[in-house]
Amino acid sequence: MDDPSTLTVGYQTFMLAAGLSFLAGFIINAFIVAVNISEWKKGRMISTADKVFTSLGISRMVFQVTCLLNVFGDIYFYRLSVLFFASVLFLELSSIYSSIWLSTLLSVIFCLKISNLQNPFFLRLKILALNRVLHLIVASVVVSISFAFVYGLMAAFKILHNSTQETYLNVYTGLSVLTLIFWSTGPFLIYFISSVLLIICLYHHVSRMRSGRNTTSHLDTYYKTIKFTGFSLFSSTVYLIIDMTYTYWYDVFGLLGCYFFWQIFPTLHSIYLIYVTTKLRIQVSNIVHKLRRRCGDPKAPLETVFQ
C-alpha cells in the first residue's frame, strides 16, 4: 500500500496520466451511449448492433469507474472498510463479464447477419437470435451481475478481517482461476469462432464481388468490417488475457500500470467503433465544428447523418 506522502513526482505524473485516460475512456463510451439513446428517444429505429453497443458502452463506463476507484482507493482511501473492497470487486466483475458476454453476443449477431448458410437449424437459430436481441442482452447482464454478486460475497468474507490491497489481490487471483475454468473460456470460444466465421464469410463475399466487377466503394465496406472484426477480436483477447494474468501485470507494472493497460484496449476499441460508424463519426465532427464556431470560425459547417 502506497503512502501518498512518499509518492515520487514521476509516479504522480503517471498517476495523473492514467487518471486522465480513465476519464477519457469514460467520456468516449458515454458519448456512444448518449448518441444511441438520443436516437431512440427521437423515435428513430435502433439496430440490433446499436443496442448491443449501447449496453457494451455502459459496462465499459462502469469498468472505467472501478479502475479509478481501485487506483485512488489503494493510494488515498485504503483504510476504508471491507464493504468498499467488496463493492468495487462486485462492480468490476459485473462490468468485466458483461463486456465479455456482450462482445460475444455482438460477434454472433454479425456472423448470423452476414452468413448465408441455408441449413434449417442455422436459419431457425438466426431468426430466433435476431428477434430476441434485447432478451439476450438482459440475460447476459443479469447472469454477469449474479456471478459477481456471489463472488463479491465470498470476497467480503475472506477480507473481513484484513481489508488490504494484498488480500484483495489474493482474492482476485483465486477468482481468476475459477473464472478461467468455468466462466471466461466458454463465451470467449464462442466469440473467437463466430469472429473467425464472420471474417471468412466476409472474405468470400469480397471474392464474389471482385469476380462480379463491383465498385470499389462496396468492397471498402467489407474491408472495413473485416478490419473492425479483427481489431475487436484482438482487443477482447488482450482484455481477457490481462484479466486472467492479473497478478503478473500487478507484479510487473504495479496496480496503476495494470489498470492502465487493462482499460486502454476497450477504450481504443470504442474509438475505432466511433471511426467506423457513420452517425457517431458525424456527431463527433459536429461537436468539433461547434467548438470551432465558438472559437471564432463562423464558416465551420455542420453535417447530418439523416437527409
Where are these regions (language model features)?
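Class A (rhodopsin-like) GPCR signature focused on the TM5-ICL3 interface and adjacent 7TM helical core
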Residues: 104-105, 155, 181-211
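Helix-to-loop junction signature of class
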Residues: 61-78, 103, 146-160, 227-230, ...
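Structural signature of the GPCR N-terminal helical module
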Residues: 17-79, 102-112, 227, 234
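Extracellular-loop-to-transmembrane junctions of the mid-late helices
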Residues: 21, 146-153, 167-194
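Seventh transmembrane helix
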Residues: 101-102, 231-237, 241-307
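Intracellular effector-coupling site of seven-transmembrane GPCRs
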Residues: 51, 55-58, 203-240
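Intracellular signaling interfaces of 7-transmembrane GPCRs
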Residues: 39-48, 115-132, 196-222, 278-307
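Fourth transmembrane helix
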Residues: 98-102, 128-159
